[in-house]
Amino acid sequence: MPSFDVVCEANMIEVKNAIEQSNKEISTRFDFKGSDARVEQKERELTAFADDEFKLGQVKDVLVSKMAKRNVDVRFLDYGKIEKIGGDKVKQVVTVKKGVSGDLAKKIVKLVKDSKIKVQASIQGDAVRVTGTKRDDLQSVIAMLRKDVTDTPLDFNNFRD
């Protein structure tokens, strides 16, 4: 029976490349001369450092533009609060989302059931498995989910026939 998984996962290699490109641009830009602006990564947690809130906004803009160039959806980023760290310096923690949250998984299952397409959706950990008898039904579910779920980037993988 054909099936596929609905997941929400960023390509961490591309995220790392975007951070390296951002740091390179920040180190060469004239408006960051002499400042301690940078972006650091620890697993799925990015930390943006800058001299003040305005420069922190500039650092985030550079990071977002580099991620967009590397085809990493910026909806994966979850911005934390801006914290002061001694003097005028500030930092902000940015978390890269992973997995389909419980609320989103329930929403996806409800959308699939309400669509009246002959498929079954089940929550399996941080993914949603959609199973049906026809491949065409699965393709119509993918099209429907891409249209209806716009607040979170969804990937479809693990296709089985």
From Swiss-Prot:
Pfam families per UniProt: DUF520
Disulfide bonds: none
Coiled-coil boundaries: none
Entry function: Nucleotide-binding protein.
Keywords in alphabetical order: Nucleotide-binding
Family stated for the protein in its record: Belongs to the YajQ family.
PANTHER family, sorted: UPF0234 PROTEIN YAJQ (PTHR30476:SF0)
Keyword Nucleotide-binding applies: yes
GO cellular component: cytosol
Superkingdom of the source species: Bacteria
Source organism: Paraburkholderia phymatum (strain DSM 17167 / CIP 108236 / LMG 21445 / STM815) (Burkholderia phymatum)
Single annotated GO MF: nucleotide binding
SUPFAM superfamilies, sorted: YajQ-like
Protein name: Nucleotide-binding protein Bphy_0527
